[in-house]
Amino acid sequence: MKTFTAKPETVKRDWFVVDAAGQTLGRLATEIASRLRGKHKPEYTPHVDTGDYIVVINAEQVRVTGAKASDKKYYSHSGFPGGIKEINFEKLIARAPERVIETAVKGMLPKNPLGRDMYRKLKVYKGAAHPHTAQQPQELKI
């Protein structure tokens, strides 16, 4: 009996919508990353993108536990000497709530071209409205 290998052209991808309101950031991100990789499917193949599309709404209502709201730091660099920037969770969630979830999920995906393709299937929006109603996403309870 041969081992089954999924073909990229035969993979069926579904659309799911996840409500981040009141969810813990890390627990939400691990489930989303697993779904983007396709590990929940029986036809999962490590070298093929078998994951689904995930639409996250209410990104500004995600929460963290303990003192992480003030202690958790996000770093960026301008590329110039001494150009490192630092912002904590509270300020980033107020300025760009989508980036908090995107950063958490991206860190849980493979660091290669396949991981970048998986990351492109993640759509994060603040508020309950999203432009993907034509895809008829199913609600995913996490």
UniProtKB/Swiss-Prot annotation:
Keywords: Ribonucleoprotein, Ribosomal protein
Entries under PROSITE patterns matching the protein: RIBOSOMAL_L13
Entry-linked Pfam families: Ribosomal_L13
InterPro entries, sorted: Ribosomal_uL13 (IPR005822), Ribosomal_uL13_bac-type (IPR005823), Ribosomal_uL13_CS (IPR023563), Ribosomal_uL13_sf (IPR036899)
Highest taxon of the lineage: Bacteria
Molecular-function GO term, any one: mRNA binding
GO BP of this protein: negative regulation of translation; translation
GO cellular component, one term: cytosolic large ribosomal subunit
Keyword Ribosomal protein found: yes
Subunit structure: Part of the 50S ribosomal subunit.
Family named by the database record: Belongs to the universal ribosomal protein uL13 family.
Protein function: This protein is one of the early assembly proteins of the 50S ribosomal subunit, although it is not seen to bind rRNA by itself. It is important during the early stages of 50S assembly.
Stated name of the protein: Large ribosomal subunit protein uL13
Provenance organism: Ectopseudomonas mendocina (strain ymp)
Gene: rplM
